[in-house]
From Swiss-Prot:
Gene designation per UniProt: rplP
Subunit structure: Part of the 50S ribosomal subunit.
Ranges for region Disordered: 1-24
Protein name in the entry: Large ribosomal subunit protein uL16
Functional note: Binds 23S rRNA and is also seen to make contacts with the A and possibly P site tRNAs.
UniProt keyword terms in alphabetical order: Ribonucleoprotein, Ribosomal protein, RNA-binding, rRNA-binding, tRNA-binding
PANTHER family: 50S/60S RIBOSOMAL PROTEIN L16 (PTHR12220), LARGE RIBOSOMAL SUBUNIT PROTEIN UL16M (PTHR12220:SF13)
């Protein structure tokens, strides 16, 4: 699982999900990618399950890059606790993904295999995404 080894502060404010991504909107490494269409939080488990779905489909060919990192803790209070008595304990690590952000990249396979691998990974993610490729000029 992706998570920071150590952090300065255990708990943070919730990140805002408004606005478009400022950087990371173009393909940097691979020939194909998954681009976010809407804003959402992506947990470290969702990132890992999307990575596994892609790598199992492409088998030994190709290389996968993960361009997002879950660096923010999201807290949760235990079930059936009364209000107050402080903030809950950190439960998940999340990456705040905004529209336009390229989350995963892939190269070394043909487009039909890449499209199917990315489709399987998109089903694991909590927001609408789109497939982009360098050849189509969508980078």
């Amino acid at each position: 699982m992706l998570m920071p080894r150590r952090v300065k502060h255990r708990k943070q404010h919730h990140p805002t999900r408004r606005g478009a991504a400022k950087g990371g909107t173009r393909l940097a490494f691979g020939d194909f990618g998954i681009q976010a269409v809407e804003a959402h939080y992506v947990t470290n488990r969702q990132i890992e399950s999307a990575r596994i779905a892609m790598t199992r489909h492409i088998k030994r060919g190709g290389k996968v890059w993960i361009n997002i990192y879950p660096d923010r803790p999201l807290t949760k209070k235990p079930a059936e606790t009364r209000m107050g008595s402080g903030k809950g304990s950190p439960e998940w690590w999340i990456a705040n993904v905004k529209p336009g952000r390229v989350m995963f990249e892939l190269s070394g396979v043909d487009e039909t295999v890449a499209r199917e691998a990315m489709r399987r990974a998109m089903h694991k993610l909590p927001m609408k995404c789109r497939f982009i490729s360098r050849e189509a000029g969508e980078f």
